[in-house]
């Protein structure tokens, strides 16, 4: 039987539909989640697709995201079969080396048994992990703060880069909001949305304001903006498991952990 992995930067509409159906089927069968963008970026400078075909039928796939030209974050969507998974991991490692990647992370739900068994056998532990949290608006009863969150201007970009410890991507900058007092940039976050699903990313408060309640007010103000746009919105965010202060903030503001992603 002919097996082949074909690497692509763009997908046809039929391929997009096939990949979405395969992902949804495996999520139901395995009871796990995949860390993937909601859309398939067209001509994306940072997305790679590896399509695993058997007799011309796509049976599994790999999606890799590279935002800095050096680090690849990849997700494998495949049946829960050991040899199948190992073959895809080997293909990913080989291809990443050809692209000149300095670092590769395989991102997996911590309940994905085949992947866990694969890394456990090799004595490999996650480099780090993230909790994926979802806002429970039905049970949230607190009054939301209403700080003014603004789009950054050219004059804000240097301060924003210092706060983020790096220059944001142009496409991220379009969705970035900042909070300022006395012309000082004190906090930032980014709101991404697809249809009625909203993600809060890149949430950073300047060190001098941490632990003083500003982060809570900025988060509440972002929630207010989203819910005023769509009262039925699904809102999510992610936080590293070691960041207990942020995790506590999110959980006291109506977010509950849905699952955990491990980065190997």
Predicted regions and their residues:
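Active-site rim helix/loop that mediates acceptor-substrate recognition in acyltransferases
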Residues: 26-54, 161-190
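Conserved GNAT acetyl-CoA-binding A-motif
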Residues: 97-109, 226-238
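Conserved active-site tyrosine of GNAT-family acetyltransferases
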Residues: 115-120, 124, 250, 255
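Conserved beta-strand-loop-alpha-helix junction that forms the acyl-donor binding cleft
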Residues: 106-114, 236-247, 263-264
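Conserved donor-binding loop and adjoining core beta-sheet/short helix segment
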Residues: 34-87, 189-198
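Conserved catalytic-core motifs of GNAT/GCN5-like acyltransferases
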Residues: 125-138, 238, 256-264
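Short amphipathic alpha-helix that is part of the acyltransferase structural core
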Residues: 1-35, 130, 140-168
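Conserved acetyl-CoA-binding loop-helix of GNAT-fold acetyltransferases
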Residues: 82-94, 205, 211-224, 247-252
